[in-house]
């Protein structure tokens, strides 16, 4: 008979995080603060999309941004130029944020004067999808150069998101990217997901994205 214990750490970590996430979500709802968790792989255009999003909505919402990275403050410096409130979060080598880290970030950001908070999660299609941050909605970006088969390779990320932005559609003619095939792969995983093709560089699709956000913020505040 073995004289040692086996502790299922992963299950315990997820269960604890889920509890923290629900508590945070209730606090955000009470305070009427909408939190968007934005995820993608590195280089998909998250920061450029954020800049376009802030430009479209800054006159309607008090926007605060949390930039999560393993290191550096390049993205926070970029977002600061938009006039939005911003804080840089260093994860100390971790490839995701969990609910506890997100709460720390919100406290550091200061949300008394923020009604729309955006978390730009660490660039990664695996780890961020596994941890509930306590967000109101989950969004992800897939860029055209990454390929239309990413939903087949990273199904969890596409399964847990409420909206998918397919970015860099302005360069689609130069890549072997089948938009309809991509839609089909995503819908198999998540029939209810909203899919919005955009180009953060040219502005195409940003109006539809901004409209979706307006609707979701309003619904959140009316719950």
What do these predicted ranges mean?
Residues 69, 167, 199:
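Active-site glycine-centered loops adjacent to acidic/histidine catalytic or metal-binding residues
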Residues 90, 142, 199:
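Residues at the C-termini of beta-strands that transition into short coil/loop
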Residues 172-223:
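Canonical P-loop GTPase G-domain recognition
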Residues 53, 83-85, 99, 136, ...:
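Residue-level signature of transmembrane alpha-helix interfaces in integral membrane proteins
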Residues 49, 98, 150-153, 178, ...:
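Residues at alpha-helix caps and immediate loop-helix transition turns in enzyme cores, especially N-
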Residues 3-26, 30-39, 44, 48, ...:
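Nucleotide-state-sensitive switch-loop elements of NTP-binding domains
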């Amino acid at each position: 008979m073995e004289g040692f214990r086996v502790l299922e750490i992963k299950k315990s970590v997820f269960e604890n995080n889920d509890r923290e996430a629900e508590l945070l979500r209730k606090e955000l709802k009470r305070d009427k603060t909408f939190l968007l968790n934005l995820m993608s792989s590195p280089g998909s255009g998250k920061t450029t999309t954020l800049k376009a999003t802030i430009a479209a909505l800054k006159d309607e919402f008090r926007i605060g941004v949390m930039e999560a990275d393993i290191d550096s403050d390049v993205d926070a410096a970029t977002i600061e130029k938009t006039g939005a409130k911003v804080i840089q979060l260093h994860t100390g080598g971790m490839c995701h944020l969990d609910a506890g880290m997100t709460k720390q970030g919100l406290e550091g950001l200061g949300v008394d004067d923020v009604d729309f908070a955006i978390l730009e999660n660490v660039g990664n299609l695996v780890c961020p999808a596994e941890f509930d941050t306590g967000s109101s909605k989950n969004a992800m970006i897939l860029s055209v150069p990454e390929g239309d088969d990413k939903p087949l390779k990273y199904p969890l990320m596409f399964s847990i998101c409420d909206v998918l932005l397919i970015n860099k559609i302005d360069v689609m003619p130069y890549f072997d990217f089948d938009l309809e095939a991509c839609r089909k792969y995503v819908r198999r995983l998540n029939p209810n997901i909203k899919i919005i093709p955009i180009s953060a560089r040219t502005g195409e699709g940003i109006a539809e994205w901004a409209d979706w956000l307006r609707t979701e913020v309003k619904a959140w505040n009316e719950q």
